[in-house]
Amino acid sequence: MIRKASVDAKAFSTALDQVSKVLRKSSIPVLSEVLVAISGGQCTLTATDIETWLFQKIPARGDDLSFVFRKTKDVAKACRLFDGELELEFSDTGEGKYRSLTLCMLCGGRAVEFEAMAAEDYPVCAPIKAKASFTVNAAALLKRVELVGYAAGKPASTERATCGNVQFSGKYVFALDGTRLACDTDESLMAPRPFMTYAESLS
């Protein structure tokens, strides 16, 4: 079975780069990759490390289809070379251990083919009921995160959960890796309740 869809190449490349920021090396292959799902004229790219989920949505045309990239980093490099309409041809043949999933990406005179994984193997994001919400200017939020992010360090399994995070509390945004503390104060940007997240997820 072959399904076909098309998206804007630059929009797809940008979305892929953005969600890929949350990816980590994992013993579970799909957690190191990006899920692509096209349905109802919309292409949704999803990436997760289980703790953090990133989604990007862009317009799409064609058949409904879904798959998980293999070697997302290599796919992202290829996508940066595309410009214009990007055609996605997804092939799903065979069954069981003989099942073969391939993705052909065509744009202008260029074409690349990658192996893919089944979308049903990707974890499902459980519904989240927000305890609080607030609206901020994205550029202002990014600036604050960049000011303190140097003290967040790189998240690693051997570290405490807070070491790779930026934390929000009221007018304060801060980061602490055990040896360094960075804090920024801005009364015009208030978090209604304390929370923390990976700095890389916000950059």
What role is predicted for each listed range?
Residues 1-203:
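Structural preference for solvent-exposed beta-strand-turn elements
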